[in-house]
């Protein structure tokens, strides 16, 4: 079920048809199941589609007047299907560092894309992670990245968002960026 809210300031909130388009420009017809006039100047449409959506794909919703909006993921993450398809039980999320390579892994099933940005030897780099099973994005860089600052650029619900690594313990001032740290070099004392 898709919920669409149209302002009555735009064609009186009326649309006789809706469809979606994915990132490959495939058209997906939508069926109006119900229509409600709301008190706040909007019309609420409940729409259905024949078939299933691919979680992580980005879809544009079109009305009959060619006005578009990005379909946003919200309630789908609370479904049994989502839990079955995207539960990830491994403990390798975040950064796995060795002096020869660093692997980045992020669980972001509703994201269209994830990139990592970092600075090495004064040069800014932005590299796309590859989508794998269960909504995990991963990338291995075959360089020594100890001490490097990094953050992720995630495209979800039609917007790019810069975020720090949710799996790391090492961040910069005010958590503005994450830091790759060789834990063996930290020499933490045991808690007494």
Tell what function each PLM region has:
Residues 2-14, 108-110:
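A short glycine/threonine-centered beta-strand motif
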Residues 12-21, 55-58, 119:
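Extended Gly/Ser/Thr-rich low-complexity repeat segments
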Residues 22-44, 98, 103-147, 153-170:
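Aromatic- and glycine-rich beta-strand/loop motifs that create alpha-glucan
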Residues 48-52:
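Beta-sandwich interaction modules
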Residues 54-67, 148-156:
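Short, aromatic- and glycine-rich surface loops/edge beta-strands on solvent-exposed regions
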Residues 58-90:
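A general sequence property marking short-to-moderate contiguous segments
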Residues 88-92, 96-99:
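Surface beta-strand/loop "capping" patches
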Residues 186-192:
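Conserved small/polar residues in nucleotide/adenosyl-binding loops
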């Amino acid at each position: 079920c898709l919920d669409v809210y149209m302002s009555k300031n735009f064609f009186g909130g009326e649309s006789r048809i809706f469809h979606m388009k994915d990132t490959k420009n495939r058209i997906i017809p939508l069926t109006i199941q119900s229509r409600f006039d709301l008190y706040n100047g909007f019309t609420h449409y409940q729409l259905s589609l024949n078939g299933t959506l691919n979680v992580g794909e980005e879809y544009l919703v079109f009305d009959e007047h060619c006005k578009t909006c990005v379909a946003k993921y919200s309630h789908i993450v609370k479904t049994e299907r989502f839990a079955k398809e995207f539960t990830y039980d491994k403990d390798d999320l975040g950064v796995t560092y060795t002096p020869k390579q660093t692997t980045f892994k992020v669980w972001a099933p509703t994201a269209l894309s994830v990139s990592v940005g970092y600075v090495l030897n004064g040069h800014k780099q932005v590299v796309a992670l590859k989508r794998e099973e269960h909504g995990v994005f991963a990338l291995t860089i075959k360089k020594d990245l100890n001490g490097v600052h990094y953050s992720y650029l995630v495209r979800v619900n039609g917007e790019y968002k810069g975020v720090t690594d949710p799996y790391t313990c090492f961040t910069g001032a005010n958590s503005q960026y994450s830091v790759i740290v060789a834990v063996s070099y930290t020499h933490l004392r045991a808690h007494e």
